[in-house]
Amino acid sequence: MKKQSGFTLIELMIVVAIVAILAAIALPAYQTYTKKAKFTEVVSATGTYKSALEVCFQTVGSLLNCTNGTNGVPPAAGASGLVTSVAVSGNTASAATITATGDATTFGATSNVYIMTAAGSNGQIIWTAPASGSTCAGAGFC
């Protein structure tokens, strides 16, 4: 009689169970990773405003008049892709805030806000990002 070679049914079932367990662990981690990668679009949307505020601060000498649509700062941006809005607000002579909001459907309504604050003094701006009030930090997106 010839000996048969191959896998038994129980061995195949064990392999399928192991693969299913690994997939169940990897899937949530992958979903968080993809949301974090998508949130970079929201963070990068602030770049134009950041550069414009720095130029305005050097030109004007304060951040007070560096608001949306003035002194080279772009007007507030509406929805585009995964970004819902970007705006400069709360300007004083030495401080300003850039707030970018991501799509609530993609990132969740409680984790879609990215805030950068500028503190200007002695001819330079020091940025804090993500600043207080950024809900994306709690979700690990920024």
UniProtKB/Swiss-Prot annotation:
Q: Does the keyword Transmembrane apply?
A: yes
Membrane-spanning residues where? 7-27
PROSITE patterns attached to this UniProt entry: PROKAR_NTER_METHYL
Major subcellular site:
membrane
Provide the propeptide boundaries.
Answer: 1-6
What the entry lists under InterPro entries is as follows: N_methyl_site, Pilin, Pilin-like, T4P/T2SS_Core
Identify the Pfam families for this entry: N_methyl, Pilin
Q: List the record's Gene Ontology CC terms alphabetically.
A: membrane; type IV pilus
What are the UniProt keywords, alphabetically?
A: Fimbrium biogenesis, Membrane, Methylation, Transmembrane, Transmembrane helix
Carrying N-methylphenylalanine, the residues are 7
Q: How does it sit in the membrane?
A: Single-pass membrane protein
Q: Does the keyword Mitochondrion apply?
A: no
Which locations, inside or outside the cell, does it occupy? Membrane
Matching entries from SUPFAM superfamilies are given as: Pili subunits
Phenotype of the disrupted gene, per the record: Mutants have no effect on the bacterial adherence to host epithelial and intestinal cell lines.
Q: Tell me which Gene Ontology terms the entry assigns under biological process.
A: cell adhesion; type IV pilus-dependent motility
Recorded hits in PANTHER family, A to Z, give: GENERAL SECRETION PATHWAY PROTEIN G (PTHR30093), PREPILIN PEPTIDASE-DEPENDENT PROTEIN D (PTHR30093:SF34)
Describe the family membership recorded for this protein in Swiss-Prot or TrEMBL: Belongs to the N-Me-Phe pilin family.
Which function does this protein serve? Major component of the type IV (TAP) pilus. Aeromonas hydrophila possesses two distinct families of type IV pili: the bundle-forming pilus (Bfp) and the type IV pilus (Tap).
> What name is this protein filed under?
Type IV pilus subunit protein TapA
Q: Which organism is it from?
A: Aeromonas hydrophila
Taxonomic lineage of this organism? Bacteria, Pseudomonadati, Pseudomonadota, Gammaproteobacteria, Aeromonadales
The gene name reads tapA
